[in-house]
């Protein structure tokens, strides 16, 4: 279907002009900052990892607070996602933080479909946002954006290679969410083994085509630090809710008989690198990548399923009006077909019901005739029994009369004999 022709005008070369005085639009950045601060920000983290691998502890350590935490058992029948939303404030900036935990992940004997509930949850958040966008009266200003901005994938510190479950899950998620792989409980592996493990993980991710989040290097302000941090992936982290006294200050650390592992000591683990990259440097980029890349991919696929597209078969631009008319025509045809199917189904159902009623009527009629014949036979039988009984009664009465007559005759004869004897 060809698009309606639209008049186009030649674009003149843009000219640069100098201002003769102050106008005021240099305050736009300040206005934007003020508006953003007043609205607040949202950030949604998905934590994927086995039960007991340290997801909750790391979240507490990252945001320097204690979140609600329910102990999860290892005996769940399947994987279910548990979102928790918190309101945080630092200086005058409000952050609505949502942490989504994958309860029961990796606990089943059959782990083949453990990734499905995670994929379904991410898609459901995209679908909710798309439905809000497509409303006639949208309220995106007040809409709570629950789309996942980052997936922290916790890798067990085996020191050998990635599990097949990890590879399959990350492969299913990499087109839907920004993934940062992290090695949990890194203090259980020696430094040399940890470095070999990092190289092995990255090699397996590349060979299996898993796309993880790369810190952006197109912004000169953060290009250098992001480029250097990309070389440190995956981050080997340690979480702790305990504070240990080192020298004259208290630090977050884990106390062992052989020594102390400091969470924020970069020679001990990559926790500081993760916090800097995730929160201080790239939080905005993670939000933008979620909207511009992952959500747009989901939105495009959904709209194409609904019949919307940018060009037709001849690569001509498609107008929204033409798409609407075409979809409306398809809908009307489909509706008519469904109405005809429903009408035919109704007619067939009526015919079936009529046939069933006629069959029931025939069965009832046959039963009635049978009962009628049975009744007539019983009536004839009773009539015969009545006649036989009446005949027996008549015979009995006749015999009774005869017996009484005979008895009376015998009685009168006896009286005569008695009189004759007396005389």
Curated annotation (Swiss-Prot):
Region listing for G1 motif, in residue ranges: 49-56
Q: Name one GO cellular component term.
A: cell division site
Q: Name one GO molecular function term.
A: molecular adaptor activity
Q: What is this protein called?
A: Septin-8-B
The UniProt annotation places GTP binding at: 49-56, 104, 185-193, 239, 254
User: Which species?
Assistant: Danio rerio (Zebrafish)
The entry's keywords: Coiled coil, GTP-binding, Nucleotide-binding
Could you tell me which residue ranges the Septin-type G domain spans?
39-305
A Pfam family that this protein carries is Septin
Where do the record's region annotations for G3 motif lie?
A: 101-104
- Annotated coiled-coil positions are 338-404
Assigned protein family: Belongs to the TRAFAC class TrmE-Era-EngA-EngB-Septin-like GTPase superfamily. Septin GTPase family.
Q: What are its GO biological-process terms?
A: cytoskeleton-dependent cytokinesis; protein localization
CDD domains referenced in this protein's UniProt entry, alphabetically: CDC_Septin
Q: Where is this region: G4 motif?
A: 184-187
């Amino acid at each position: 279907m060809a698009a309606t022709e639209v008049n186009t005008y030649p674009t003149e070369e843009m000219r640069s002009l100098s201002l003769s005085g102050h106008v005021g639009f240099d305050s736009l950045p300040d206005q934007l900052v003020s508006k953003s601060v007043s609205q607040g920000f949202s950030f949604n983290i998905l934590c994927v990892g086995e039960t007991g691998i340290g997801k909750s502890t790391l979240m507490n350590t990252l945001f320097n607070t204690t979140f609600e935490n329910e102990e999860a058992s290892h005996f769940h029948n399947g994987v279910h996602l548990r979102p928790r939303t918190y309101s945080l404030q630092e200086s005058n900036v409000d952050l609505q933080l949502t942490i989504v935990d994958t309860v029961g992940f990796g606990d089943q004997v059959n782990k083949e479909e453990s990734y499905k509930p995670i994929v379904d949850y991410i898609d459901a958040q995209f679908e909710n946002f798309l439905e809000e966008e497509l409303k006639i009266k949208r309220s995106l200003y007040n809409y709570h954006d629950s789309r996942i901005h980052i997936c922290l994938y916790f890798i067990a510190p085996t020191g050998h290679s990635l599990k097949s479950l990890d590879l399959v899950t990350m492969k299913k998620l990499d087109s839907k969410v920004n993934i940062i792989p992290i090695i949990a409980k890194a203090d259980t592996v020696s430094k040399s083994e940890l470095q070999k493990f990092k190289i092995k993980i990255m090699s397996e991710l590349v060979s299996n085509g898993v796309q993880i989040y790369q810190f952006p290097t197109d912004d000169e302000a953060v290009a250098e630090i992001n480029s250097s941090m990309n070389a440190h992936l995956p981050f080997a982290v340690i979480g702790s809710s305990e504070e240990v006294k080192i020298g004259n200050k208290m630090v977050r650390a884990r106390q062992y008989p052989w020594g102390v592992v400091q969470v924020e000591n970069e020679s001990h683990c990559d926790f500081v690198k993760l916090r800097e990259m995730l929160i201080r440097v790239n939080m905005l980029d993670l939000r933008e990548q979620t909207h511009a890349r992952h959500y747009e991919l989901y939105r495009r696929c959904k709209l194409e399923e609904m019949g919307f597209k940018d060009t037709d078969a001849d690569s001509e631009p498609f107008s929204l009006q033409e798409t609407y008319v075409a979809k409306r025509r398809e809908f009307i045809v489909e509706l008519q077909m469904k109405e005809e199917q429903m009408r035919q189904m109704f007619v067939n159902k009526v015919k079936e019901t009529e046939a069933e009623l006629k069959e029931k009527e025939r069965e009832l009629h046959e039963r009635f005739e049978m009962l009628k014949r049975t009744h007539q036979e019983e009536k004839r039988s009773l009539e015969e029994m009545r006649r036989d009984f009446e005949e027996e009664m008549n015979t009995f009465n006749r015999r009774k009369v005869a017996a009484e007559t005979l008895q009376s005759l015998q009685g009168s004869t006896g009286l005569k004999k008695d009189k004759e004897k007396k005389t």
